[in-house]
UniProtKB/Swiss-Prot annotation:
The lineage of its organism: Bacteria, Bacillati, Actinomycetota, Actinomycetes, Mycobacteriales. This is ESX-1 secretion-associated protein EspI. GO terms for molecular function: ATP binding; ATP hydrolysis activity. Residues 22-31 have a biased composition (Low complexity). Residues 1-81 interact with EsxB while residues 35-186 interact with an artificial EsxB-EsxA heterodimer. Required to repress ESX-1-mediated secretion under low ATP conditions. This function requires the ATP-binding motif. One of its GO terms (cellular component) is cytoplasmic side of plasma membrane. Residues 222-231, 357-371 have a biased composition (Basic residues). The keyword Heme does not apply. Residues 1-15 have a biased composition (Basic and acidic residues).
C-alpha cells in the first residue's frame, strides 16, 4: 500500500498562519517607530510568550555585580631625605580609588613580566678573576697589596639629580564597549621626595673619592701565526692555548710602564678578559714588603730593552721572576725557547688531554743481506747452457771446491814462510814437485815467491822452472851485503807466472859444498823481501846444507814414490824428524805419493794413503798422478799440465797454507 505523503506532511489544524499575518512585513529592529499592533483576531499561540529582550549585550551585564578589582600595588618606600637636618615630611595616606567597572571582555590581564635576559652562549658569566700580579719594579719588589685592594671595585652609587621631573601617569588602557563609556581610574603614583633647591648637597655616606676609570687596554698585538692558529695542533689543543693568543697581560704591563701611567691609589689593575680561563693564570706572588722605589721618569727608549741596558743584572732577575704563564701568553704561537716547569695537579687535571691522530710507528727496515750474484760457470754443461740460453745456473760443485782451495792459498802468513821439499831417495820427483808447487803458489797468490836449489849434488831446479840468467847462489854469496830486494833480484830468474828461482852452483865448476852458514846468509835477507821461500833439498838429512834448511823452515813436504821401498823411506824420514828435535815440522808435514811411471803400480795406493794418514794430519796426504808434460823433463808450464795434476798441486798448496796463520818463522 502506497503511503500518502500529502497527508503525512499536512500541518495540524490551527497551526497555519492567517493570510493577514503572512502578509506582514519583516520586523526591522533599527526602525524609529514601534511596530504596528497585532490585530485582535489573531489566534493565540500555544504556551506563554517570553518577555522581549534587548539586543544590546552591555545591558545584560549591567545588572550583574562587578567583580572586585585587583588590589593596587604597594607604594614604594619613602626615599632618604638629602638634607641632613630636615626631617622627612609625612605624606598623606593615599585615598582608596573607586572601584572601576568590570570590562565586558572580562578581568584585565596581568601586566607582562619583564623579559628574562638571554643566557650567554659560552655559559654562565664566570666570576671575576683575581687581578694579575703587578710587574716587579727595577729597584726591588713592590709592596704587598691589601685585601681591600685585591677585592674587585664596587660600582658607584647613582645620585638622584636635582629637580628631576616627576614620572607622568601612564594612561589607562582603552576598553571598547557598546555600553556607556566609563573610563578606568588607576591608583595615583606616590610623589617623589622633594629635593632642596639652592642648598649645598649633603655629605654622602660613602667616601667621595670615586674609583678612577680603569686604564684603557691597548689593542692586542699578535703575530700572524697566533692569529692564524697553530697548524700542527688539534682543536682541543687550540682551546687550551687560548690564554697565549688572547690579550696578553705582559703586553699591557709593558704598555703602562712605557707610557709612564700610574694607577690611582684606590684602584687596581683591570682583571683578565672574560673569555680566558682562570686556571691557566699563575697565582700572584707576594714578595716581602720593601720600600717602593721611585718610579723612573718616562724616557724615549723605555721598555725591556732600556731596562737591560741600564740594569742588566736586575733585568735578568726580573725575567727569571716572571711566571711562565705570562711568558707563554706573550709568546703566542711562537715556539718556546726554554722548557716550561711542571704544572701542579690542579692545572694538569683542568688541561684536557690532546687527542691527535694516531700515528703508526714505522719501524726502520733493516737492510736485507743481498746475495752476491752468481758466478758464471767456465766449464762443463753449465757453461754451455749459459752460452746458449743466457741462463746462469751458477757454479758446479767441482768449481766451488776449486774456489775454496784458492781462498785457502791466498791466506797471509805471519812473517815469511819457508817450505822444504825433502826425501831420502833420489828420483822421487822432488825437483819437479818444487817447480810445480812454486808456480802454483805464484799464480794464485800473485806475490813474491823465491825457489832455492839447495841440492848439493848438482840440482837442476832452474832448468825445470826456466833459466834466464847464468847467476847462481855462489854469485849471491860473493855479495858483501844483501840489504835491498834488488841485491837478490839481480841474480834470480823468473818464469811466466812470476816465480823467481836461484840455482845452485855448477857441480863441475864448484870449489866447495854449501854449508849451513851459506844458507843463513841467503835465507835471512830473502825472508825480508819474499813472502814464501821454497827449498829443493837433496837426498838425506845429514849434509850441512839440509841441516841449515831444516833449522829455518816452517813447513816440510816428504816425497815418496809409488813403491814399497819408497813408502818405507818416507816413513823413516818422518820418524827421523820426530827423533831429532823437529817434532813441530813432523806434525805439520805433508806426504806426497808421486807416480813417476805410467801405468798401474805394483802396490795398492789406497793402502799407502791409509798408512800415512795415521802419521800426519788428515788431508795432508796427496797422490800425484803421472803427467806426460812432467815426464818430458823440460821447463814446466802450468798451462801444459793435466787438470788432475794441477788440482793435486793446488790441494797440496792449500794444505800447506792452513799453517800460515799458526806458524811463523822459526
Amino acid at each position: 500500500m502506497a503511503a500518502d505523503y500529502d497527508k503525512l506532511f499536512r500541518p495540524h489544524e490551527g497551526m497555519e498562519a492567517p493570510d493577514d499575518m503572512a502578509a506582514q512585513p519583516f520586523f526591522d529592529p533599527s526602525a524609529s517607530f514601534p511596530p504596528a499592533p497585532a490585530s485582535a483576531n489573531l489566534p493565540k499561540p500555544n504556551g506563554q510568550t517570553p518577555p522581549p529582550t534587548s539586543d544590546d549585550l552591555s545591558e545584560r551585564f549591567v545588572s550583574a555585580p562587578p567583580p572586585p578589582p585587583p588590589p593596587p600595588p604597594p607604594p614604594p618606600p619613602t626615599p632618604m631625605p638629602i638634607a641632613a637636618g630636615e626631617p622627612p615630611s609625612p605624606e598623606p595616606a593615599a585615598s582608596k580609588p573607586p572601584t572601576p567597572p568590570m570590562p565586558i571582555a572580562g578581568p584585565e590581564p596581568a601586566p607582562p613580566k619583564p623579559p628574562t635576559p638571554p643566557m650567554p652562549i659560552a655559559g654562565p658569566e664566570p666570576a671575576p678573576p683575581k687581578p694579575p700580579t703587578p710587574p716587579m719594579p727595577i729597584a726591588g719588589p713592590a709592596p704587598t697589596p691589601t685585601e681591600s685592594q685585591l677585592a674587585p671595585p664596587r660600582p658607584p652609587t647613582p645620585q638622584t639629580p636635582t629637580g628631576a621631573p616627576q614620572q607622568p601617569e601612564s594612561p589607562a588602557p582603552h576598553v571598547p564597549s557598546h555600553g556607556p563609556h566609563q573610563p578606568r581610574r588607576t591608583a595615583p603614583a606616590p610623589p617623589w621626595a622633594k629635593m632642596p633647591i639652592g642648598e649645598p648637597p649633603p655629605a654622602p655616606s660613602r667616601p667621595s673619592a670615586s674609583p678612577a676609570e680603569p686604564p684603557t687596554r691597548p689593542a692586542p698585538q699578535h703575530s700572524r701565526r697566533a692569529r692564524r692558529g697553530h697548524r700542527y695542533r688539534t682543536d682541543t689543543e687550540r682551546n687550551v692555548g687560548k690564554v697565549a693568543t688572547g690579550p696578553s697581560i705582559q703586553a699591557r704591563l709593558r704598555a703602562e710602564e712605557a707610557s709612564g701611567a700610574q694607577l690611582a691609589p684606590g684602584t687596581e689593575p683591570s682583571p683578565a678578559p672574560l673569555g680566558q680561563p682562570r686556571s691557566y693564570l699563575a697565582p700572584p706572588t707576594r714578595p716581602a714588603p720593601t720600600e717602593p722605589p721611585p718610579s723612573p721618569s718616562p724616557q724615549r727608549n723605555s721598555g725591556r730593552r732600556a731596562e737591560r741596558r741600564v740594569h742588566p743584572d736586575l733585568a735578568a732577575q726580573h725575567a727569571a721572576a716572571q711566571p711562565d704563564s705570562i711568558t707563554a701568553a706573550t709568546t703566542g704561537g711562537r715556539r718556546r725557547k726554554r722548557a716550561a716547569p711542571d704544572l701542579d695537579a690542579t692545572q694538569k687535571s683542568l688541561r684536557p688531554a690532546a687527542k691527535g691522530p694516531k700515528v703508526k710507528k714505522v719501524k726502520p727496515q733493516k737492510p736485507k743481506a743481498t746475495k752476491p750474484p752468481k758466478v758464471v760457470s767456465q766449464r762443463g754443461w753449465r757453461h754451455w747452457v749459459h752460452a746458449l740460453t743466457r741462463i746462469n745456473l751458477g757454479l758446479s760443485p767441482d768449481e766451488k771446491y776449486e774456489l775454496d782451495l784458492h781462498a785457502r792459498v791466498r791466506r797471509n802468513p805471519r812473517g815469511s814462510y819457508q817450505i822444504a821439499v825433502v826425501g831420502l831417495k833420489g828420483g822421487a820427483g822432488k825437483t819437479t814437485l818444487t817447480a810445480a808447487l812454486g808456480s802454483t803458489l805464484a799464480q794464485v797468490r800473485a806475490d813474491r815467491i823465491l825457489a832455492l836449489d839447495a841440492d848439493p849434488g848438482a840440482g837442476n831446479l832452474a832448468d825445470r822452472v826456466g833459466r834466464q840468467s847464468g847467476a847462481t847462489i855462489a854469485d849471491v854469496l860473493a855479495e858483501k851485503e844483501l840489504s835491498h830486494y834488488n841485491d837478490i833480484r839481480a841474480h834470480t830468474s823468473v818464469n811466466a807466472v812470476n816465480l823467481e828461482v836461484l840455482p845452485a852452483p855448477e857441480y863441475s865448476s864448484a870449489q866447495r859444498a854449501l854449508s849451513d852458514a851459506d844458507w843463513h846468509f841467503i835465507a835471512d835477507p830473502a825472508s825480508r823481501f819474499y813472502n814464501l821461500v821454497l827449498a829443493d833439498c837433496g837426498a838425506g838429512f845429514f849434509d850441512p846444507l839440509t841441516r841449515g834448511v831444516l833449522s829455518t823452515v816452517s813447513g816440510v813436504v816428504v816425497v815418496a814414490s809409488v813403491s814399497i821401498d819408497g813408502a818405507q823411506q818416507a816413513s823413516v824420514a818422518l820418524d827421523w824428524l820426530r827423533n831429532n828435535g823437529y817434532q813441530d815440522l813432523a806434525s805439520r808435514a805433508c806426504v806426497v805419493i808421486n807416480h813417476i811411471m805410467p801405468g798401474e803400480p805394483n802396490v795398492a795406493v789406497k793402502d799407502l794413503v791409509r798408512h800415512f794418514e795415521q802419521q800426519v794430519q788428515p788431508g795432508r796426504v796427496v797422490v800425484m798422478p803421472w803427467d806426460r808434460h812432467i815426464a818430458a823433463g823440460t821447463e814446466i808450464s802450468l798451462d801444459l799440465l793435466d787438470p788432475i795434476y794441477k788440482r793435486k798441486v793446488l790441494e797440496l798448496a792449500a794444505a800447506l797454507s792452513d799453517d800460515f796463520e799458526r806458524a811463523g818463522r822459526r
